[in-house]
């Protein structure tokens, strides 16, 4: 009895949109059309949009230029010897002179003494090459044996 009354109340209180099986889709579409147009009323869609966009682009370019200038000034400090390098490279008077430097050149004689890594690499290459040749030879041998067995 209680169940019948709950079902009857459900049918009586159910509207076409809330809980009923007949849903009017066209009515819902008409309600949702043009509801959110106010959120698009900004300066980006008005006459002033060109001025705003130009100002934004100008600020962005200025910021990028400032960053580039700061990076160059930080890198071109005294420790990099930028002016000294420019003089050595671009002055004609320094072509005959040798430039003095406190850095020692790379000495190749020390490299010749370390021959052990080269020996190890050559042994490894020899073993790898031998393994490849052995596996190719073994593969051909097994193919030939299987071909002979199938012919018999």
Swiss-Prot record:
Topological domain ranges for the Extracellular compartment? 136-152
Instruction: Provide a GO CC annotation, any one.
Output: plasma membrane
Query: InterPro entries, per this entry?
Result: EssA, EssA/YueC
> According to the record, what happens upon gene knockout?
Mutations abolish synthesis and secretion of both EsxA and EsxB, without affecting their transcription.
Q: Give the residue spans that cross the bilayer.
A: 115-135
Membrane-topology annotation of the record = Single-pass type I membrane protein
Q: Which domain of life is it from?
A: Bacteria
Q: Pfam families given for it?
A: EssA
Q: Name the keywords, alphabetized.
A: Cell membrane, Membrane, Transmembrane, Transmembrane helix, Virulence
Segments on the Cytoplasmic face: 1-114
Q: Where in the cell is it found?
A: Cell membrane
Q: Which cysteine-cysteine pairs are annotated as disulfide bonds in the entry?
A: none
- Name the predominant localization: membrane
UniProt record similarity statement:
Belongs to the EssA family.
**Task performed by this protein:** Component of the ESAT-6 secretion system (Ess). Required for the secretion of EsxA and EsxB.
Q: What is this protein called?
A: ESAT-6 secretion machinery protein EssA
Q: Which gene encodes it?
A: essA
């Amino acid at each position: 009895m209680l169940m019948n009354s709950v079902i009857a109340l459900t049918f009586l209180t159910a509207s076409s949109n809330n809980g009923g099986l007949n849903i009017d889709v066209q009515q819902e579409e008409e309600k949702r059309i043009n509801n959110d147009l106010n959120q698009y009323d900004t300066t980006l869609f008005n006459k002033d949009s060109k001025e705003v966009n130009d100002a934004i682009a100008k600020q962005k370019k200025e910021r990028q230029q400032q960053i580039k200038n700061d990076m160059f000034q930080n890198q071109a400090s005294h420790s990099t010897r930028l002016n000294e390098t420019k003089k050595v490279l671009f002055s004609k008077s320094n072509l005959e002179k040798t430039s003095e430097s406190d850095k020692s050149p790379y000495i190749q004689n020390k490299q010749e003494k370390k021959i052990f890594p080269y020996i190890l690499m050559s042994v490894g290459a020899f073993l790898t090459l031998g393994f490849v040749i052995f596996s190719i030879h073994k593969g051909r041998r097994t193919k030939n044996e299987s071909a002979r067995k199938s012919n018999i």
